[in-house]
Amino acid sequence: MGYPELLRVLGEEAAREAREVRAAADRECARILSEARAAADGARAAVLARVREESEAHRRASREAIALERERALLVERRRQLERLRLEALARLRGAGGPALDAALLAELLPEAGDGPLEVIVDPGAEAEVGRALASLDPAVAARAAVRAAPEARGGVALVAGRRVLDDTLPSRLDRAWTVLEAEVARLLFGEG
């Protein structure tokens, strides 16, 4: 084998080795590219999943906030309607007083009156009737009691005995009853419970 033949064989060998190195480099490049694509696809899928979860959480929070605001507005409206009903009942009660009612309420209060001087506060114009009712219920109490008119009609009577004020007016009775009955009234009006 001569020098030219040796050069040719060495050239072929170098070309073959170069092809093998290029093929190995191409395979390694394809492997690295495939791994990079798989990693990018995984990262993209993870980011998309997280974005979907965050978006769903945001939508859920928005729906809950809207529902909460709707419930709050409904509660405010129901409270407003209940208060309007209470005020309407109060207005009707103010005109419901009369001598018979005043006498009945006075009879309930007298046992709690005590022994000192008394002041009986009644609707304007009802002083004489209540004075007569008081005298017929208990003349001794009537002797130590002063009957005076309230600034405005409210229905019922109030009894002042020293520092104690025994309020048996219709608005006072409504206030006491309202705390007990408000839930039942709401249930009847709004179908709750």
Curated annotation (Swiss-Prot):
UniProt xrefs under HAMAP family: ATP_synth_E_arch (MF_00311)
Physiological role: Produces ATP from ADP in the presence of a proton gradient across the membrane.
Keywords tagged on the record: ATP synthesis, Hydrogen ion transport, Ion transport, Transport
Protein name stated in the entry: V-type ATP synthase subunit E
Single Gene Ontology MF annotation: proton-transporting ATP synthase activity, rotational mechanism
Record's keyword annotation contains 4Fe-4S: no
One example of a Gene Ontology biological process annotation: proton motive force-driven plasma membrane ATP synthesis
SUPFAM superfamilies with a match to the protein in the record: V-type ATPase subunit E-like
Keyword Membrane: no
Family of this protein: Belongs to the V-ATPase E subunit family.
Superkingdom of the organism of origin: Bacteria
InterPro entries the record matches: ATPase_E_C, ATPase_V1_Esu
GO CC entries: proton-transporting two-sector ATPase complex, catalytic domain
